[in-house]
């Protein structure tokens, strides 16, 4: 077994030998060649006013200071309570990788690495950046599927990534035991960097461009002023800031509490081990690539002539620093470590010795056990915080070194230009809310840490901490009948099962046990009538004398007449799609706005911010948790609901997109004639406590019509056939509404100068480079999920955005962005799925006409086109 060395050098972190920089004067990083700056001292200078105050001197905070100052922002101040890198940065293993299983974070990783590659030349500071590449190991067939899945999601990105055979792996990592290795995922350019040196280089660059980095300068108080500025108090004095950015690492919770916020963060212990010199490693002619054994759940890299490896224990064995959760971080904690606990990671040590046998010859010369901070879903929180003006966060970084460079650039661009440079909704701090309790956060953080290296399936569900307090009124009635999905704290039915059907959660890269039940739900909606729980929708009430002016400023569509609803989009100043909502004009000057569950606070923050900036006299209320929503859809929907209300629901009286207040089974509801299925349907908004009674009444009334339930998976198949776009997939901050095919909802000729109007006019005048198209393809047992590569003539030319099996034509269906010249109906392309390219053809959309369109055609004597 691995022999413990003569001593465990706690607190001593062995660094790799730094690479030597080139002599000579570094080029300017300020964008102002030849302009000399006087030397700045972090200890002696002070400012009374600042444009931006960054709280926290770890790698992320210093990166933001660097990027803001480099971009030309004056009066950038960073306040650090002890010294730069104190906290989690100084003891990090320093891994860098282009890989990320998600889509948007690949851009963050890319920007980080590209910055780190040039930072030494720019600043004259050595950063110790090694780029030997990295290999992820597949030792099971399902891992090979996962790698194929990730390959197709990388083809349309700038990142280099290759699926390599065992022979190539052996050549690149000759010390590996190849008995179980089936394949590898190889990223050239991956590696590791010295976190301390990296931070000091960023600090040098920030100072050179005029930023003030002040330490030790602990923030003791934060006070918001009525004009949106902040008073920042420290022992050295106070400072007025136009905005503050919380980048305080594991101190972020304490900073948040100063202004009444409870950030969902949990400090966890993470260990890695450094070995003595290993002769076989020392004899190598080149540095080993970083190794990630996913089944063993550890990373391993070369550290001088030895090895460094760090495991991720299971959620049962991992260690949360509970005392910090309860009592806060000890005031003096900065560059300390925890006691090592090798017993906790022994199974991973054994796995590493089996995979890399030379480890058996080594001594342990160092065990590093330090704190890192986890959010519930392991992703950081980056951006402005809803409900608190000019308060931004960059917190919760479990992988701060690889995120720091890219996040600093991303956040700097957002602060300077008023909108995010690209879509990164998964990092939005407003994805959490009051439902995110400490108990939930700890349960999810444990799960996320323990699941670091599990297989990443599409449609993945994780079950720790569920359900939250946010369950709909129907949860107990439906939970035994369906597979629930988690949406912003809510439980929502994904698919329903019948007696005798497989009810287990069985994730797969191929069609799995929900495929047939979802097909039945699809037919139920298309042929009869079905009910779905839509309670997770975000719901806002807006009223006041300026409500119409505010909404006309926010939305690209016109404001609907009283008693009607429309689909409207909020755009960014550059004309990108920030959000999609339904807007119902309930009474003169009073509106009900509906958005998706995942964008509730994301959208609310934008609306509130614009209302304050413009000085609009409005009242905005978030009523998401007050209202339940039932969707009733299908050709028999009118017949069923008519039994329960005295209101005339006929087509001529209750028109498409009309909204009315009425009673259903004597229960007050706001009924909107709309359905994301594209079929005849209503959304029924009601008091949350009435959900069970309303549901029971509808189900009882629909017995003769064969009423049943349906979930979100069937909804997705239905909306794709109707060519309905989904926010976050077909449209987001990476797309404009013209290329997304949303022209109908954009009124460039309306009098109001809505946000993004002028930019959109310019986009239209210049012409589009790509378009969203709908395509069909015949596959084996796999369907598009979104973000797969589109091929044409041997090259990747675009990407899917979402997909499903079409139960009407029994083929796969997908939306995709392709170049304009390849966007014509009938154009043939290929879609890559699990390592195979399938022929696909662009079709005239929609595949299936919506119920209102079919009605209009029938009235004109046309045919019911499908």
Swiss-Prot record:
Tele-8alpha-FAD histidine modified-residue sites: 91
Gene3D superfamilies the record matches: Aminomethyltransferase beta-barrel domains, D-Amino Acid Oxidase, subunit A, domain 2, FAD/NAD(P)-binding domain, Probable tRNA modification gtpase trme, domain 1
EC number(s) per entry: 1.5.8.4
Entry-linked InterPro entries: FAD-dep_OxRdtase, FAD/NAD-bd_sf, FAO_M, GCST_C, GCV_T_N, GcvT/YgfZ/DmdA, GcvT/YgfZ_C, TrmE/GcvT_dom1
Ligand binding (FAD): 59-60, 80-81, 87-95, 219, 251, 397-402
Pathway the protein acts in: Amine and polyamine degradation; betaine degradation; sarcosine from betaine: step 2/2
Positions of region (Disordered): 20-42
Cofactor(s) needed by this chain: FAD
Location of the transit peptide in the chain: 1-50
Positions of (6S)-5,6,7,8-tetrahydrofolate binding: 580-582, 676, 683-685, 744
Cellular compartment(s): Mitochondrion
GO molecular function: dimethylglycine dehydrogenase activity; electron transfer activity; RNA binding
Protein keywords: Acetylation, Disease variant, FAD, Flavoprotein, Mitochondrion, Oxidoreductase, Transit peptide
Job description of the protein: Catalyzes the demethylation of N,N-dimethylglycine to sarcosine. Also has activity with sarcosine in vitro.
Protein name according to UniProt: Dimethylglycine dehydrogenase, mitochondrial
Organism: Homo sapiens
Gene name in the database record: DMGDH
């Amino acid at each position: 077994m691995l022999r413990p060395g003569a001593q465990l050098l706690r607190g001593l972190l062995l660094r790799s030998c730094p690479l030597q920089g080139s002599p000579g004067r570094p080029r300017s990083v300020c964008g102002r060649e030849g302009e000399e700056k006087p030397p700045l001292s972090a200890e002696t200078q002070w400012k009374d006013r600042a444009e931006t105050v960054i709280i926290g001197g770890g790698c992320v905070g210093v990166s933001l200071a660097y990027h803001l100052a480099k971009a030309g922002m004056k009066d950038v101040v960073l306040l650090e309570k002890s010294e730069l890198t104190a906290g989690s940065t100084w003891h990090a293993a320093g891994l860098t990788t282009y890989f990320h299983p998600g889509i948007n974070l690949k851009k963050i990783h890319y920007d980080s690495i590209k910055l780190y590659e040039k930072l030494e030349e720019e600043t004259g500071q050595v950063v110790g950046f090694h780029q030997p590449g990295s290999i992820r190991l597949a030792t099971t067939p399902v891992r090979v599927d996962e790698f194929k899945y990730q390959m197709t999601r990388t083809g349309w990105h700038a990142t280099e990534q290759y699926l390599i055979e065992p022979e190539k792996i052996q050549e690149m990592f000759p010390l590996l035991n190849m008995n179980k290795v089936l394949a590898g995922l190889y990223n050239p350019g991956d590696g590791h960097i010295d976190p301390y040196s990296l931070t000091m280089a960023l600090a040098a660059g920030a100072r050179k461009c005029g930023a003030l980095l002040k330490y030790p300068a602990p923030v003791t108080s934060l006070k918001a002023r009525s004009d949106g500025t902040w008073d920042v108090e420290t022992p050295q004095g106070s400072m007025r800031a136009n905005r503050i950015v919380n980048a305080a690492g594991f101190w972020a919770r304490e900073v948040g509490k100063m202004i009444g916020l409870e950030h969902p963060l949990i400090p966890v212990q993470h260990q890695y081990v450094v070995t003595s010199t290993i002769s076989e490693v020392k004899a190598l002619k080149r540095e080993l690539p970083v190794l990630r054994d996913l089944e063993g759940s550890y990373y391993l890299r070369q550290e001088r002539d030895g090895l460094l490896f760090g495991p991720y224990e299971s959620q049962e064995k991992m260690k949360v620093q509970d005392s910090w959760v309860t009592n806060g971080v000890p005031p003096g904690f900065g560059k300390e470590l925890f006691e090592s606990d090798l017993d906790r990671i022994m199974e991973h040590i054994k796995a590493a010795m089996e995979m890399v046998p030379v480890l058996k010859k080594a001594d342990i010369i160092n065990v590093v056990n330090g704190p890192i901070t986890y959010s519930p879903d392991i992703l950081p929180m980056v951006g402005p915080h809803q409900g608190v003006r000019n308060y931004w966060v960059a917190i919760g970084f479990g992988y701060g070194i690889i995120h720091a460079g890219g996040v600093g650039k991303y956040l700097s661009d957002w602060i300077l230009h008023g909108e995010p440079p690209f879509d990164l909704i998964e990092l939005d701090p407003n994805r959490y809310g009051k439902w995110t309790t400490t108990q939930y956060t700890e349960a999810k953080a444990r799960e996320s840490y323990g699941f670091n290296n599990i297989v990443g399936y599409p449609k993945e569900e994780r079950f720790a901490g569920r359900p939250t307090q946010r369950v709909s009124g129907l949860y107990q009635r439906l939970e035994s009948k369906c597979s629930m999905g988690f949406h912003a704290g809510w439980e929502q039915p994904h698919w329903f099962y019948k007696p005798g059907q497989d009810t287990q959660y069985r994730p797969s890269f191929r069609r799995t046990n929900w495929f047939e039940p979802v097909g039945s739900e699809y037919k139920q909606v298309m042929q009869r009538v079905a009910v779905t729980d839509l309670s997770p929708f975000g719901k806002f009430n807006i009223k006041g004398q300026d409500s119409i002016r505010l909404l006309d400023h926010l939305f690209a569509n016109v404001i609907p007449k009283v008693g009607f609803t429309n689909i409207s989009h909020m755009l960014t100043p550059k004309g990108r799609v920030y959000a999609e909502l339904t807007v119902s004009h309930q009474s003169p000057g009073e509106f009900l706005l509906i958005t998706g569950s995942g964008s509730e606070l994301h959208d609310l923050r934008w609306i509130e911010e614009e209302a304050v900036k413009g000085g609009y006299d409005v009242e905005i209320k978030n009523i998401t948790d007050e209202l339940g929503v039932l969707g009733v859809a299908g050709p028999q929907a009118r017949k069923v609901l008519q039994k329960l209300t005295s209101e005339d629901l006929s087509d001529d009286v209750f028109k498409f997109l009309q909204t009315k207040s009425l009673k259903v089974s004597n229960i007050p509801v706001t009924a909107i004639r709309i359905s994301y299925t594209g079929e005849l349907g209503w959304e029924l908004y009601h008091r949350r406590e009435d959900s069970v009674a309303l549901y029971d009444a509808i189900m009882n009334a629909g017995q003769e019509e064969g009423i049943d339930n349906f979930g979100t998976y069937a909804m997705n198949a239905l909306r794709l056939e109707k060519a309905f776009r989904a926010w976050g997939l077909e449209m987001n901050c990476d797309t404009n509404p013209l290329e997304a095919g949303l022209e109908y909802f954009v009124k460039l000729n309306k009098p109001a100068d809505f946000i993004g109007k002028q930019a959109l006019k310019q986009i239209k005048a210049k012409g589009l480079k790509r378009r969203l198209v709908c395509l069909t393809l015949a596959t084996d047992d796999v369907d598009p999920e979104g973000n797969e590569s589109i091929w044409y003539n041997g090259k990747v030319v675009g990407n899917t955005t979402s997909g499903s099996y079409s139960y009407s034509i029994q083929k796969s269906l997908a939306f995709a962005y392709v170049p304009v010249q390849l966007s014509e109906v009938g154009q043939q392309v290929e879609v890559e799925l699990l390592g195979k390219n399938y022929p696909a053809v662009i079709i005239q959309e929609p595949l299936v006409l919506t119920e209102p369109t079919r009605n209009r055609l029938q009235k004109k004597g046309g045919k019911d086109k499908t």
